[in-house]
Swiss-Prot record:
Keywords, sorted A to Z: Disulfide bond, Mitochondrion, Transit peptide
GO BP field: mitochondrial respiratory chain complex assembly
Classification via InterPro entries: COX23, Cys_alpha_HP_mot_SF
Any one GO CC term of the record: mitochondrial intermembrane space
Broad class of the protein's primary localization: mitochondrion
Natural source organism: Paracoccidioides brasiliensis
Disulfide bond annotation, renumbered to this chain: C33-C64, C43-C54
Listed name of the protein: Cytochrome c oxidase-assembly factor COX23, mitochondrial
Annotated motif Cx9C motif 2, positions: 54-64
Subcellular location: Mitochondrion intermembrane space
Entry function: Required for the assembly of cytochrome c oxidase.
Chain segments annotated as transmembrane: none
Length: 76
């Protein structure tokens, strides 16, 4: 995957996940950034747990989480 694409995705991921998150049952948990978490884990496995090789994936996950929490705070 192209590193630039990984960095640009968090906001679009939130927009795609927003309906699923807002329509979930009250007892349900939905993380729109789970895809980024999965990609990070796959990268770590692929690179023998070398964190330096996966820094773009980690940053994309952090950016997604930050965007998500900001959106939720603004909504409240």
């Amino acid at each position: 995957m192209d590193a630039d694409k990984v960095k640009e995705e968090p906001q679009s991921v939130w927009e795609k996940a927003k309906p699923m998150f807002t329509n979930k049952p009250a007892s349900g948990y939905y993380d729109p950034c789970q895809d980024f978490a999965d990609r990070s884990i796959k990268c770590m496995r692929r690179n023998g747990n070398d964190k330096t090789m996966c820094s773009d994936y980690f940053q994309a996950y952090r950016d997604c989480k930050k965007e998500w929490t900001t959106q939720r705070k603004n909504k409240s």
